[in-house]
Swiss-Prot record:
This is Uncharacterized protein PF3D7_0207100. Keywords: Coiled coil, Merozoite. Residues 582-612 have a biased composition (Basic residues). Residues 1080-1110 form a coiled coil. Possible candidate for an effective malaria vaccine as determined by epitope response in sera. GO terms for cellular component: cytoplasm; membrane. Residues 615-629 have a biased composition (Low complexity). Residues 524-574 have a biased composition (Polar residues).
Length: 1745
């Protein structure tokens, strides 16, 4: 099985990582699994790694067990068959047609380990609606109203569900304004639709789904992520009067209405492929979009006006309007259409409405040709990305052909990326943006309306002024609202994607976004300055948004905005560039003068300078305001998003806790007002100097700092000497504040981090750098780092990354492993480039990997943390440090570095240097000042225990450790052993890195001497006969660890090779450390060495530094290297996720078109199936749940009744009444002197004294054991556990004490058995003695009983020592046997499971085990319930709390101990028991303490809760048994299938990680299991016991009320009965008189009198007194009647002579047999008893009591 550990790769997705990166929409995860099964063989976009460097070419995909979106595959070597099946498809006439031009992503996209990811468009779970109005109320003249969006989280069940997105046909009177703003409600994520005319294909129908209520207000369709965008945050709807008639038709809206003359069809086209393959269809596509989307209403109004025909007439005048508008606004359209998308690096939004439809058609092919000629001339300035060069060239040519062939631009609709996690955050912002409802600022609303209507530049000059004002007002609204609220959250950068006219063009040319001329950049620069000026002008006031000065500036300079020729614009731009350069030089000179001032002054000056710069640039930038109006809108929105990050930088961290979206994990630029202008200036210089080959090594002036997170916006970083870097645009996400984010995706972009770091450095270089520092230096360093991050090389990072003094590379040697903690502030070159080079050559491995000089600091830090390494594992090192107060024979003069390494962990904390050791505790990390961006925030958030390395990493580790062994040279020699007679034995001398090992053979090591401890190595004698043989001695310092003493030891060796002596001598001279005696010699040597060169002094210093290195054993090396590679793997996993995210955003439109083309054909059928499928599932689940509950209730009732009548009640009576029956029968057998009271006194006294003495024994033994060992080991813990068992199970102990005297406890609690046998034997003897001396003892009193118990305790004290010896022996023997058996069985089962890994078989087995365990557990719970009830003396006054506490504690302990402790813990810990026995017992103790606390706290709290609130009880009508059944059912749900599956996965995981993980994984799993158990108990048990307690109290109150009513009735009945008695006496007197009369008349009229007599007697006769009183007799006093009517209440019956008979063991019915017959196994004949008593008396007489 050893060879399999490199062949399999498993991803265990469990633990802190809540959500993988591909699960973006939470609501869509489990619903689309069956829908997407048909897409398995469809062409998938692939992200290939460097295939040439991976010989196996295996594709590793991360798998979610229940998801089919991303599948785990290990492809075979022959992938040709699958490649043949791959093809692109397009939809033509509702059929699949393969495309010849097959576009794939470049196979060498990035250095990732994932080769294939399946990207599938998911149906959008929209969180918005569109308000539609009936046709009957439409008017020809209407106005657009803008309503602020609000979140409809209260109707999320219907709104955000996937089957409500595209649904059925709308009613006849419901219509919709199909506008560019609201069309996106019908779209999928990352998908684009278009609409065609009547000539297109068949119609599309949708299913009906009425899932929403009517008459909703403020219906929204916008995404939560678009809160901060100005124009995308508002939706338009017409006719606000009809607001109450809204039906939520955005789920029922159709593209095609049967009664509508203007039909539409929905199709999806690819943005690039469609333009390239079919130019004619593209032109039709443009015309159709223009016609359909710009029509006001697509339906006929009630007045009979055909609006479609009316719009067709408008089309006739289209060409004339185009020509007029073209002459006026050629230049403005040129700038708005093409320059804005090129300059727009962020996902800004430009809204296009239907009012200015002609302006979109004002482009000609000549102008486009000019643009692309300029773009092609400047394409050298594209970022040098090796893997994308070929793709960029293809995209340039393709984009040029597509746009040239298209006569009109593409007017696409908007796509909004849905983020369901921002719902709560959106609710918080809802009240501050309700413009359409409250109308707080009417001016702002009107301005926003104008802004929505006027998106194009082709308007008069006066209109342009209004647009500028409107933009500034909209920005001011956002800025002021941000100032009012401090809880704003950072805007999601990718959430504002909207596909409209400009965005479509921008996405086509996205790869050319950096291809710009210097002239265009100057225009952009003015735009940035102008946007910053606008913000400064309008940030102070809320309503007075624009001042008169700005209006004058805009209006006065509007005439200069437009030029007839392009050359004028270019010349103006060139002049702008020169002016900006001059202005920049002046700023640099001013700022360099102020660099030595304090930080506070620098902050004030920075604020004043930003204002001055904005004011100076204000008048200069007015000339190009109108030219770049489109740029201004885009850049202003970009500034708006960035300002959100500015103002919320300090407070935004707390809000980011709720946002777990991967898109929000980025380093947002913290821009200030004048930062954009400086950024553009720096970029101009960088682009102009790209091709210069003068790369200056300016790394000595820079350092990647250790960034400390503060609440303020600025990060002040300490750098060596006088340099100080102040960062404004680098946001550090703290671990504590970003816990949720880092759990999901602990990664950042490498290249993006470098860009942001150096851009921020360039922004502030005016205050940082000296006069000699140039922008070229910074740029060259950035480019070098980016090459090393993206390329294949590894060596450039060491030299170019950091400086000589502060760098990480300078502190390392050639033969040293570049571990993480060797330098605290920096990344290591090997860490950065490990995943790119999995199988290096042997030479490279020898240079980079093969080294064994591991610093002791790394191992010491592990040991100090106390998590991974314990005292049993750490190898004893001879050179271990002594305490500070102890004086050694030899003191080493450590330098500062070694002092830090050997200092304790507390001293390291006091120095305030936080190491990057990933094993540090969280509390210790928070105390430190510095944080490392890569490790603290990302690596520590990943659960290392769930991480596995792939095969190549294991091979690296194995190869590296083997090289450590290979470098150790061994020589054969002889060593002197004898003292008097010289006797030499053959040995092996092994020259290790820092130790000299002397071995007798390969297995037996004689000693291990550190080179630093060797004092002298000399040749003693050379043999005259054999010249090669010689004697040499080694004198070293021997240190005793316990006594802390040292002494010199001399060893004699005899060898034939002089090489041995030379090697040892060289190692000792290299590592020699001067002692106190040599200080004087050093002082003399220093005087002589003054004349030496600097190089020799440096070499000596470097030799002295190596004295801190020590030899570490191979096992420790394995552990450390594995931990290192794990963290490297986590780092690369983060980088990989970020790269995949970047590529996913870049190519998502193209791939979504491709998938949508395939998904389009069968989506109608899937929609029909969805509704039926979901309804069917809900119906079946509801029915199954109801049937299961009904069956379980019936089953429990059946089990309770049968078990109650069969065995449980008899067992209870037998155990609880045993003592009473024994004493009662013995009393009747011998004499009557011993009464019942005295027997009860004896019972109670013996029990209490027994309990006290046992507690004393436990405490004394534990105390003595702690004194000896200073730790609670396993034996001491068994005693404490036994004591807790005695306290918890008092009733069970009583029954066992006086019934069987035999106990069957488990291994750990065997101490109970031993003490019972010793102590109870004495109690029985004392009882027999009392019974035998019945003649002499007349009365038994309490004093005699106490005296007897004291005598018994003295006897038991004498036997205590032997009992403990027996216990100790038995515990360890039984534990070893049982643990061995359990481990063997479980390991065998685990091996079989892993070898025969079948998913179906595993699920079946888990189901069977689950059912079996639940069935057994239910029966056990019922048995324990009736066992623990105990004898109840009084039925009316019953202590419910005690009874239910005992039930809960007993059941919980039994289940947890048997199912968890003896199976899981013993299996996991047995594998570690060889080295960690103390750890084993400590873990078990923690679990036991936790369970005890839960029993005490939870139950008592629930009982108190029931007493306070009895009226909220919902099971009032149920009986006690039914309530308990419900509690048991709730309790059983705790142990579900998930825990069993996790347990099997852990076994599978431990199988492959056993030799590496050892202790840490086992203990970590235990702690995690305890945490899960604690959480489950709190969630399940509280409700169960609340039910029980509420029922009890309710029943008690109900019974009390009934009893009071019965008493009142009985009193009334007694009064009535007394009156009736008086009347009856009077009636008796009258009857006697009547009898006399009747006798007289009997003779005359016998027949008639007889008949009358009988009637009168029958009617007048009253019931007898017995009948009268029995009728109203209280039935509760008669236990027999209660048992017949309520058999469950038998346990409440009193102890009476009627109930003293015992039941037979075999039969469940009561028996009247004698006690001697029933307990024949316990009692013999009377003669034998008398003999035993006689023998007992003889023995007791010999004992000294």
């Amino acid at each position: 099985m050893d060879s399999d550990k490199y062949k399999k790769f498993y991803v265990y997705n469990h633990g802190f990582t809540k959500q993988p990166f591909y699960e973006r929409n939470l609501n869509d995860k489990g619903i689309h699994l069956k829908e997407l099964k048909r897409l398995e063989r469809v062409d998938e976009p692939r992200l290939y790694n460097n295939v040439d460097k991976i010989p196996n070419k295996k594709e590793i995909i991360y798998n979610n067990i229940k998801s089919n979106n991303i599948q785990v595959r290990v492809n075979q070597n022959n992938n040709e068959e699958k490649k043949k099946e791959e093809a692109n498809y397009t939809c033509v006439n509702n059929k699949y047609v393969t495309l010849k031009n097959k576009v794939h992503v470049n196979k060498y996209v990035n250095n990732s380990n994932i080769n294939k990811i399946k990207i599938v468009p998911i149906i959008k779970c929209s969180n918005y609606k569109i308000k539609n109005n009936p046709i009957s109320h439409l008017k020809s003249n209407y106005e657009n109203k803008f309503v602020k969006l609000s979140n409809f989280s209260n109707i999320k069940n219907g709104c955000s569900h996937k089957d409500n997105v595209i649904n059925e046909t709308m009613d006849q009177h419901k219509s919709e304004q199909l506008n560019n703003d609201n069309i996106k409600k019908l779209l999928y994520d990352y998908c684009i639709f278009r609409e065609d005319t009547i000539k297109t294909k068949t119609n599309i129908s949708y299913n009906k789904m009425n899932s929403f209520k009517d008459n909703e207000e403020n219906i929204n369709y916008m995404d939560n992520n678009n809160i901060k965008s100005n124009s995308s945050s508002y939706c338009s709807y017409s006719n606000k009067i009809n607001q109450n008639n809204v039906n939520h038709t955005h789920l029922k809206t159709e593209f095609l209405n049967e009664k509508n003359s203007h039909t539409q069809n929905e199709q999806s086209i690819p943005l690039l492929d469609g333009l390239q393959n079919n130019h004619n269809s593209a032109t039709k596509f443009h015309n159709n979009i223009y016609d359909n989307n710009n029509s006001l209403v697509n339906y006929k109004s009630d007045k009979g006006i055909d609006l479609h025909n009316k719009m067709m007439k408008i089309e006739t005048d289209k060409n004339g309007i185009i020509t007029l508008e073209k002459k006026k606004h050629d230049e403005k359209y040129y700038n708005n259409i093409f320059l804005n998308p090129l300059n727009d690096n962020s996902n800004n939004v430009v809204i296009t409405t239907c009012d200015n439809k002609e302006s979109y058609r004002n482009s000609t092919s000549d102008m486009i040709n000019k643009i692309f000629e300029k773009m092609m001339n400047e394409k050298k300035n594209i970022l040098k990305m090796k893997n994308f060069n070929d793709v960029i060239k293809k995209k340039i040519t393709m984009a040029k052909e597509k746009i040239l062939n298209s006569n009109s631009t593409i007017n696409m609709k908007k796509v909004s990326f849905y983020n369901s996690k921002d719902e709560d955050l959106f609710n918080e912002k809802e009240n501050s943006y309700k413009y359409g409802v409250k109308r707080e600022n009417q001016e702002d609303i009107n301005v926003i309306k104008n802004n929505m209507k006027r998106n194009n530049i082709n308007i008069d000059n006066n209109d342009n002024i209004n647009i500028i004002k409107n933009d500034s007002v909209s920005k001011n609204i956002h800025i002021n609202n941000k100032k009012k609220r401090d809880d704003d959250f950072p805007f999601n950068n990718s959430a504002g994607l909207l596909l409209d006219f400009d965005l479509c063009k921008r996405k086509v040319l996205e790869i050319l976004k950096n291809v710009q001329s210097s002239k265009k950049k100057n225009k952009i620069l003015t735009n940035h300055n102008h946007s910053s000026d606008n913000q400064n002008c309008h940030s102070s006031d809320n309503q007075n948004c624009h001042s008169s000065d700005n209006q004058n500036c805009h209006s006065s300079d509007n005439q200069n905005c437009h030029s007839s020729d392009n050359q004028n614009c270019d010349s103006n731009a060139c002049n702008k560039k020169d002016e900006e350069k001059k202005r920049k030089k002046k700023k640099i000179k001013k700022k360099n003068k102020m660099k030595n001032k304090s930080n506070n002054k620098s902050k004030n000056k920075r604020e004043t300078k930003s204002k001055k710069i904005s004011n100076n640039n204000n008048n200069d930038n007015m000339n190009n305001q109108c030219d770049n109006m489109g740029d201004q809108r885009i850049n202003n929105e970009n500034m708006d998003k960035q300002n959100v990050n500015i103002q919320n930088e300090g407070n935004g961290f707390n809000n980011n806790k709720n946002n777990n979206d991967l898109l929000n994990v980025y380093i947002s630029p913290n821009m200030i007002n004048h930062s954009l202008s400086s950024t553009c200036e720096k970029k101009n210089k960088e682009d102009n100097k790209m091709n210069d080959n003068k790369f200056l090594n300016s790394s000595s002036k820079m350092k990647i700092p250790e960034i400390s997170t503060n609440n303020s916006n600025e990060k002040i970083v300490n750098v060596s000497n006088d340099e100080m870097l102040v960062y404004h645009n680098l946001t550090v996400l703290n671990v504590k504040e970003q816990g949720g984010v880092t759990e999901e995706s602990s990664c950042i972009k490498r290249t993006y981090f470098v860009d942001q770091f150096y851009d921020s450095y360039n922004m502030r270089n005016e205050k940082i750098t000296d006069d000699n520092m140039q922008v070229e230096d910074i740029y060259n360093v950035k480019e070098n780092i980016k090459r090393t991050l993206k390329g294949d090389g590894h060596d450039d990072v060491k030299t170019n990354m950091l400086s000589e003094d502060n760098s990480y590379a300078s502190g390392l040697w050639g033969n040293e492993i570049n571990f993480i903690s060797n330098n605290e502030n920096c990344l290591n070159s090997y860490d950065i480039s490990c995943d790119e080079k999995y199988i290096p050559n042997e030479e490279e491995q020898d240079e980079e990997l093969c080294s064994n000089n591991i610093l002791v600091k790394d191992i010491e830090e592990k040991k100090m943390c106390g998590k991974l390494f314990f005292e049993e594992i750490c190898v004893f090192r001879i050179n271990e440090k002594n305490e500070h107060g102890h004086e050694n024979l030899r003191k080493n003069n450590h330098n500062d570095d070694t002092h830090k390494m050997y200092s304790s962990y507390e001293n390291i904390q006091n120095i305030n240097k936080q190491s990057t050791n990933p094993f540090c505790k969280k509390d210790e990390m928070e105390k430190s000042q510095g944080t490392n961006l890569f490790y603290d925030n990302y690596i520590n958030s990943v659960d290392i225990t769930k991480l596995e390395l792939n095969k190549n990493c294991y091979q690296h580790i194995n190869y590296e450790v083997q090289n450590l062994i290979k470098k150790e040279n061994s020589y054969a020699a002889e060593m002197n052993v004898g003292l008097v007679f010289r006797k030499y034995i053959p040995i092996l001398i092994n020259l290790s890195c820092n130790y000299l090992l002397i071995k007798k053979n390969e297995k037996n090591v004689i000693t291990c001497i550190s080179y630093t401890n060797i004092i002298d190595v000399k040749i003693v004698k050379k043999s005259k006969k054999n010249k090669e043989r010689f004697l040499f001695k080694i004198v070293y310092v021997f240190k005793k660890k316990e006594q802390k003493t040292e002494k010199n030891v001399t060893l004699l060796f005899r060898a034939n090779l002089m090489e041995i002596f030379e090697k040892i001598k060289g190692r000792v001279d290299y590592c020699i450390i001067p002692n106190e005696d040599d200080k004087n010699i050093q002082l003399q040597d220093k005087k002589k060495k003054k004349g030496k060169k600097k190089k020799e002094l440096q070499e000596e210093k470097m030799k002295k530094k190596k004295k801190t290195q020590e030899y570490v054993d191979i096992e420790t090396v394995y552990e450390y290297v594995i931990e290192k590679y794990k963290r490297v793997h986590v780092l690369y996993l983060g980088r990989l996720l970020q790269i995949v995210e970047k590529l996913f955003k870049k190519y998502i439109l193209k791939y979504s078109f491709h998938k949508l083309r395939i998904f389009y054909e069968y989506k109608i059928e899937m929609e029909k199936l969805k509704k039926n499928y979901i309804h069917c599932i809900y119906d079946i689940s509801d029915k199954l749940e109801f049937l299961i509950k009904k069956k379980m209730q019936h089953y429990f009732n059946h089990i309770i009744i049968n078990s109650y009548e069969s065995s449980f009640i008899n067992y209870q009576i037998k155990t609880n009444d045993m003592l009473y029956n024994l004493l009662l029968k013995e009393k009747s057998a011998y004499q009557n002197h011993l009464g019942k009271n005295y027997i009860l006194i004896l019972y109670k006294v013996l029990l209490s004294m027994y309990k006290k003495k046992m507690a004393i024994y436990f405490r004394s033994f534990v105390y003595n054991n702690i004194k000896v060992s200073k730790k609670k080991n396993a034996f001491a813990y068994t005693l404490t556990r036994v004591n807790s068992i005695l306290v918890l199970y008092e009733r069970r102990i009583k029954s066992f004490i006086f019934s069987k005297l035999k106990f069957n406890y488990d291994n750990v609690s065997y101490f109970c058995f031993t003490m019972y046998k010793i102590y109870l034997r004495r109690i029985l003897f004392g009882y027999l003695r009392i019974r035998d001396n019945r003649i002499n003892i007349k009365n038994v009193i309490e004093k005699n009983v106490y005296r007897l118990v004291k005598l018994i305790s003295k006897i038991s004290d004498n036997h205590k020592y032997n009992a403990f010896l027996k216990l100790q022996k038995y515990v360890y023997e039984q534990n070893e046997k049982k643990n061995k058996m359990i481990c063997d069985n479980l390991i065998y089962a685990n091996n079989e499971l892993c070898n025969n890994l079948d998913k179906i078989a595993i699920e079946k087995g888990i189901n069977q085990i689950d059912c079996l365990i639940k069935f057994k557990r239910k029966e056990c719970l019922m048995k324990y319930f009736y066992t623990l009830k105990g004898p109840q003396i009084n039925t009316e006054r019953f202590y419910y709390c005690i009874r239910y506490c005992s039930i809960f504690s007993f059941v919980l302990n039994k289940i947890i101990q048997k199912k968890v402790q003896h199976i899981f813990f013993q299996f996991v810990l047995k594998t570690l028991q060889r080295n960690n026995k103390n750890r084993l017992t400590h873990a078990i103790k923690l679990l036991q303490v936790l369970v005890q606390k839960k029993e005490k706290k939870s139950v008592i709290d629930v009982l108190q809760l029931y007493d306070k609130y009895p009226y909220i009880f919902q099971y009032k009508d149920l009986t006690k048994i039914e309530v308990f059944v419900i509690c048991v059912q709730n309790f059983v749900t705790l142990y579900n299938r998930k825990l069993l599956l996790n347990f099997l996965l852990k076994l599978h995981y431990l199988k492959y990680q056993e030799q590496f993980m050892k202790t840490y994984n086992g203990i970590g799993s235990i702690y995690k299991f305890v945490h899960v158990l604690d959480k489950k108990l709190m969630n399940t048990i509280r409700e169960s016991f609340r039910v029980i307690l509420q029922n009890d109290k309710f029943l008690r109150e109900k019974m009390n009320m009934k009893m009071e009513q019965m008493d009142m009735k009985m009193e009334k009945i007694d009064v009535n009965m007394d009156q009736m008695d008086v009347k009856m006496e009077q009636m008796d007197v009258k009857m006697e008189q009547m009898d006399v009369k009747m006798k007289r008349m009997n003779k005359k009229k016998s027949k008639q009198i007889h008949v009358n007599y009988n009637n009168k007697a029958y009617s007048s006769s009253s019931p007898s007194p017995m009948l009268r009183y029995n009728k109203y007799k209280d039935m509760s006093s008669n236990s027999a009647s209660l048992i017949k009517k309520y058999p469950f209440l038998i346990y409440n019956s009193e102890i009476s002579p009627d109930c003293t008979t015992m039941a037979d063991d075999k039969l469940s019915l009561p028996s009247n047999e004698s006690v001697t017959h029933i307990f024949s196994y316990a009692y013999e004949d009377m003669d034998k008893i008398k003999k035993k008593i006689y023998d007992f008396n003889n023995k007791m007489s010999n004992v000294d009591l």
